[in-house]
Amino acid sequence: MYTDPYFSRFVLPEDLKEALQKSRFLCYPETIEQLAEMSYGPAHSSRYDVSYSIAGKGLVKEAEVARCKNGTVVNFMEDYMRRRDPDCMSIGDDLPTDKPRFSDRYGYPFAELRKETMDWLSTQQLILLPFKAGGPYFGYESLMVCPVNAAFFALALANMQGFTSIFDVHDEYKPRAIIYVAPPFRHTHFNGRQAVIHQRCEDLHEVFSYNLYPGPSAKKGVFSMLLDIGEHEGWITNHASAAMLESPYENEVVFMHEGASGGGKSEMLEEIHEEEDGKLLLGVHTVTGEKHYLTLRETCKIHPIADDMVMAHKDMQDDGGFLKIVDAEDGWFLRMDGDTGYGCNAEYERLSIHPSEPLVFFNMDGVPGATCLIWEHIPDSDGTPCTNPRMIIPRRMTDNIIPGNEPQEVEVRSFGVRMPPSTDEHPDYGVMGMVQFVPVSLAWVWRLVSPRGYKNPSIADSNAGSGLKAEGVGSYWPFATGKKVTQANMLLHQMLDCPNTLNILIPNQHIGAYKVGFMGEWLVREYLARHNGTIKMKHLVPARCPIFGYSLDEMKLDGQYIRQTFLRPELQSHLEDGGYDAGAKILTDFFKEQLQQFLTDDLDPLGRQIIELVLRDAPLEDYLALTPMNLK
C-alpha cells in the first residue's frame, strides 16, 4: 500500500482513496514549473509522446508534446481530438436532469464503469492536483487525478483555474469537485469517441474524462461543476465576457456580454478594428456596395474582467440593484483561428512570442527549441489548418485587467446575436437595429432561446430552413447537468434582482442589408460608455418588432450621427416595412417553437406570463407592465 506525508490531508470518496493507496506512485506538484517539466516525460525530452497500451490495438499514441521557447505545445494525432465533441456529455447519477443518462445511452449502470476506472487508476502513476474550481479567490476546493504521462492536461487545468501547491493544502481538504482522467477508456469503451461523464451528489460533483482534449473537461467540465454547485446554492456562472470601459471623459462603465457561440463575447474585449487610414468601416451595403465610414478621435480604454465564464456568487451580491461579478477563471483558453498571419492580433502575438512565463498551446505547429507562433496552426489530415488552435493566457499577463478578487457592478448587460443579410427581395431575420433596449422580461426570453444564428464559426449544424438553432438557457445550457426549467427560473430571478442594470441586444454580421461585422457592437460600447451606461426614455422609440423592445432614435459619436437606417432597419430602402416584418416573423416563430418546452408546472409563474406574451404576439407595453424599465 502506497503512503506519503500528504495523502492524509485529503478527505476523499472511499473507492478513490483505495485506488490511490494501491497506486504505484503519487505525485503532488509543488510548483507550476515542476508540473510543466513533467509534461516532457521522465527523460525531460524536447518532444514526448503520450501513449497508452490498448487491448487489441497495441500502443496508441494520443498526443505529442513539444518543448518550445515560449511554452508547451500539445498536438493530438486525430483531427477528431482537436476540438470538443458537443455530444460527449452523459449523466452517471439518478438526480434530475434533461441531459442523456449514461445508463440510457450505453445500456448499463455507470457504477460498473466507475469501478473499472478506479481499478485502472490504481495501476497507474498519478498526479494529484488540487485547484479552486471558479478561480483562486472565490472558487471551490477541488482535485484532479491524472496519469503522470498526461501531465500536460494537469498543466492546462492549472493555467486555466490557477495552480495550488501541495504546500498550500490544509488538513481535512475535502474536494467539492473532482476530475478523473482515464484516456484509454475512449478506445476500450466508447469506440474512439470523446466521453465525459458527470456524477453528482449533494456535496460532490465528479467529472470522468475519458479523453485528453481539455475543452470538455478541464474547461467546460469546470463550468458544469460551477453550474451544479450554483444550482444547489442559488447563484449562476454566466456564459459571458466582461470589461470595464474607461471613456475619453473618464467615465467607467462595466459591460457584461452574453450570447451563443459567435455572439461577440471575445470581441467585447477587443479594440475597435480600424482601416489603414484610421477610419472605422461602419457597414457595406450588400446590394449597392456603398460603404459607410466613421472617425473617432479617441476610443475607450478596455479593462478586461472575464473572457468566457463570469461568476455571480450570491455572497457578492447586495441591494444596490446591479449584478456583481468576478472572473470564474484564472486563465483564458483562447481560440486563435482568426490569427492567420503576423499582424492579425498584435496584443496576443506580443504576449505569446515573448511571454513573461511559459504558455500552453494546442493544435499549433510546435518545433522543439523554436518559438511557437500562434498563426501557424497544425494541419488537419486533409492539409487544411486546424480550425481550433488554442492557447492559454493567464489573467495576470493581460494588460489593464481588473484583479480577480475585486467584484464589479454590471451597468450594461448585452446579448449578441449573429444576423444574416435581409432585404425586401430576400427577407430574413437579420432585422435588429444596431442596439435594442429591452426590459428584463425580454432580456430573459432572449437568453432562454440563445439563438446561434448566421454562419456560426464554431457550430456546423443548423435548424432546418432558418439557419437558427437554440443554444439554450443563458447560452450555458450545453454545459449544465440539471433541468432547463430550474436554470430558467434562476436566470429570471438573477435579472429581476438587478433593476438598475441596463439590458440591451446587439446584432453582429448584418443589420438589414448592411454587412457590419462586429462594428456595431464596438460602437454601441463606445456610445454607452460615453453616456455612463445609461439612456433616457425620450431617446427611445418602440421597435416595430415587439421582442426587440425599443430602438434608439439617434446616435451621435464625436459629433457624427449614425444613419437611422442602422438604428431602425425598416427605414432601409432595400428592406422597408414588408421585408422587416417578414424577417421578424421568422424570428418570432422560432422563439415560439423554442419556448414551448419551458411551460411546465415547475416554471416560475412570472416566467409563464412572459412566455405567454411571446406566444400571443403581445405588444411591448405588456412586457413593460410585467417588468418596467428603470429609465428616466
Predicted feature descriptions by range:
Residues 139-144, 269-270, 315-319, 338:
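Short acidic, glycine/serine/threonine-rich loops at helix termini
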Residues 137, 215, 263-266, 276-278, ...:
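Flexible loop/turn segments at secondary-structure boundaries
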Residues 215-248:
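N-terminal pre-Walker A segment at the start of P-loop NTPase domains
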Residues 1-215:
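Long, basic/Gly/Ser/Thr-rich N-terminal segments
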Residues 254-256, 319-333, 517-529:
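Conserved, well-ordered active-site substructure
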